[in-house]
């Protein structure tokens, strides 16, 4: 646990932080039908108020997953703080089969010790299903809470939790010398940082698979350029700045390659750079436009948008050669692909009858499900555990970030108060 904190700290501590209005998750649909669970306020043994409401953070994480509906404190039959204090029958009578209890106490060195227990209240009443403790400093209290949430979530669902992940996105503010900002926050909008500010547009951030770098598009040189920024040091490496368009970067799952789109020869085509040697290979050719690459888990196959059939649709191709294969057939057009980490499905922007929504296509069966009903949806990005998708949509005169579960049942938004937010990218596990 401590080593995990050190690794993430090495990535975060050198970023420039700026006081901004942060985004916060506002649930709009689906939590009422989720699995009920009890998350009791953690007991604070120090003086005054607790430095963080750890139980509230864990409860919010589980609620934000769309799979759990933590019972309100006012409805709790009791507020135990240890396993021995839990009365299983009181909880199971409310349809709750698991309860989280915990404690937070100050330590002599100025840090804090957090401990929790996940208690079964139904099938094996009183049994501890999961437990852990974390010794942390104040700035890592939320991270420790997210760690507990990850463990509880995985124990109850069998799916790895993604509460210790982050979001990258572009914010366009009104006025000022640097109206375009690349920002990063925790998945829930807390701990927001500014990575880069620019007087010119920024676009399309993409995470490296180790979470240490971001690739993005900048127009600061007077034309588009692709760069990779190392987050801990701030070092920027220019990848491509050819005439016309340079865009749509995507790291391969193993981190050895970067795919992107260039129009240096006329139409847009896909290219792949070996990041070790800096050698660039052209992958697609012809007069059609080919862009927005997303990698399959094999590190050899790209899913991308092409208008070779007339309107934009999704295709896939092997980067080592071979004919492209069309993937999408439903809808007027489909674009902006993001392939799930397991390669089982792809998220995309699907257009039909003037509507533009986020859709999911099963890559084995071809079945398509429209997930959203928001307006002018764009740029979906899948959480690393495959359960949630973040995307941008138009709301009023601006753009905001939205969340939807990959089954379409749970929906939420992350409104920002100081600008328009676009191009969200969900980090890998950190």
From Swiss-Prot:
Primary site of residence: periplasm
UniProt entry keywords in alphabetical sequence: Cell cycle, Cell division, Periplasm, Signal
Protein name: Tol-Pal system protein TolB
Subcellular location: Periplasm
Family: Belongs to the TolB family.
Subunit structure: The Tol-Pal system is composed of five core proteins: the inner membrane proteins TolA, TolQ and TolR, the periplasmic protein TolB and the outer membrane protein Pal. They form a network linking the inner and outer membranes and the peptidoglycan layer.
Pfam families given in the database record: PD40, TolB_N
Example of a GO biological process term: cell division
PANTHER family registered for this protein in UniProt: PROTEIN TOLB (PTHR36842:SF1), PROTEIN TOLB HOMOLOG (PTHR36842)
Residues annotated as signal peptide: 1-21
Cellular component GO terms held in the UniProt record: periplasmic space
Cystine pairings recorded for this chain: none
Source organism: Photorhabdus laumondii subsp. laumondii (strain DSM 15139 / CIP 105565 / TT01) (Photorhabdus luminescens subsp. laumondii)
Coiled coil: none
Entry keyword annotation includes Signal: yes
HAMAP family tied to this protein: TolB
Known function: Part of the Tol-Pal system, which plays a role in outer membrane invagination during cell division and is important for maintaining outer membrane integrity. TolB occupies a key intermediary position in the Tol-Pal system because it communicates directly with both membrane-embedded components, Pal in the outer membrane and TolA in the inner membrane.
Keyword Ribosomal protein attributed: no
């Amino acid at each position: 646990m401590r080593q995990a904190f050190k690794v993430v700290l090495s990535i975060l501590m050198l970023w420039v932080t700026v006081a901004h209005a942060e985004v916060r998750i506002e649930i709009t649909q689906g939590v009422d039908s989720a699995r009920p669970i009890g998350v009791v306020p953690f007991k604070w043994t120090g003086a005054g108020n607790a430095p963080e409401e750890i139980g509230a953070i864990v409860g919010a994480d589980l609620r934000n997953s769309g799979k759990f509906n933590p019972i309100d404190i006012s409805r709790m039959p009791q507020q135990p703080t240890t396993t021995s204090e839990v009365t299983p029958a009181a909880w199971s009578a409310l349809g709750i089969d698991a309860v989280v209890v915990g404690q937070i106490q100050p330590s002599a060195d100025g840090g804090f010790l957090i401990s929790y227990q996940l208690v079964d209240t139904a099938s094996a009443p009183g049994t501890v299903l999961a437990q852990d403790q974390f010794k942390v400093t104040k700035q890592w209290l939320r991270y420790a809470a997210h760690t507990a949430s990850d463990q509880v979530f995985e124990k109850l669902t069998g799916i790895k939790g993604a509460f210790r992940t982050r979001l990258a996105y572009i914010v366009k503010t009104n006025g000022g010398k640097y109206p375009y900002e690349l920002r990063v926050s925790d998945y829930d909008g807390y701990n927001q940082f500014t990575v880069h500010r620019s007087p010119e547009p920024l676009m399309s951030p993409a995470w490296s698979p180790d979470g240490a770098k971001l690739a993005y598009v900048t127009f600061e040189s007077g034309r588009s350029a692709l760069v990779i920024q190392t987050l801990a040091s701030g070092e920027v490496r220019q990848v491509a700045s050819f005439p016309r368009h340079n865009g749509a970067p995507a790291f391969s799952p193993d981190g050895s390659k970067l795919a992107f789109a260039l129009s240096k020869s006329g139409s847009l085509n896909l290219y792949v750079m070996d990041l070790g040697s800096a050698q660039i290979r052209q992958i697609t050719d012809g007069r059609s436009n080919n862009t927005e690459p997303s990698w399959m888990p094999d590190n050899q196959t790209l899913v991308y948008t092409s208008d070779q059939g007339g309107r934009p649709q999704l295709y896939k191709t092997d980067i080592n050669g071979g004919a492209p294969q069309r993937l999408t057939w439903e809808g007027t057009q489909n674009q902006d692909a993001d392939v799930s980490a397991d390669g089982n499905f792809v998220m995309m922007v699907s257009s039909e009858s003037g509507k533009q929504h986020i859709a999911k296509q099963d890559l084995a069966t071809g079945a398509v499900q429209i997930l959203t009903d928001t307006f002018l949806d764009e740029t979906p990005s899948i959480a690393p555990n495959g359960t949630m998708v973040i995307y941008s949509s138009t709301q009023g005169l601006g753009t905001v970030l939205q969340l939807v579960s990959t089954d379409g049942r749970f929906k939420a938004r992350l409104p920002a108060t100081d600008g328009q937010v676009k191009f969200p990218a969900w980090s890998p596990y950190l």
